[in-house]
């Protein structure tokens, strides 16, 4: 699966901004069929950042969210700034 097909859009809200600042986490809508390995590979390819942990959930509307925790040596704020959301 192509990295651009896996990662759809970043989720921007007060909650996600708090996660970026306090927990070094990013939140994206992802392709529903994407596995955690697909998501991790896409983050590495698109943002050159290593993933420490991924949690996923499917919303009642059928969209899949990925909560991505980056390793300590990477800053989620810098990745968010490169996307223009922070």
From Swiss-Prot:
Regions annotated as coiled coil: none
Q: Which Pfam families does the entry link to?
A: Ribosomal_L23
Identify one Gene Ontology CC term for this UniProt entry.
ribosome
Instruction: Cite a single GO BP annotation.
Output: translation
Which InterPro entries does the protein's record reference?
A: Nucleotide-bd_a/b_plait_sf, Ribosomal_uL23, Ribosomal_uL23-like, Ribosomal_uL23/eL15/eS24_sf, Ribosomal_uL23_CS
SUPFAM superfamilies found in the cross-reference section = Ribosomal proteins S24e, L23 and L15e
Q: Which family does it belong to?
A: Belongs to the universal ribosomal protein uL23 family.
Q: What is this protein called?
A: Large ribosomal subunit protein uL23
Write the lineage as a comma-separated list: Archaea, Methanobacteriati, Methanobacteriota, Methanomada group, Methanococci
């Amino acid at each position: 699966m192509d990295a651009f097909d896996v990662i759809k859009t970043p989720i921007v809200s007060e909650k996600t901004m708090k996660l970026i600042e306090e927990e070094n986490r990013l939140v994206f809508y992802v392709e529903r069929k994407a596995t955690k390995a697909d998501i991790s590979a896409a983050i590495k390819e698109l943002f050159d950042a290593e993933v420490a942990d991924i949690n996923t959930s499917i919303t009642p509307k059928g969209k899949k969210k990925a909560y991505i925790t980056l390793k300590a040596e990477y800053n989620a704020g810098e990745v968010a700034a490169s996307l223009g959301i922070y």
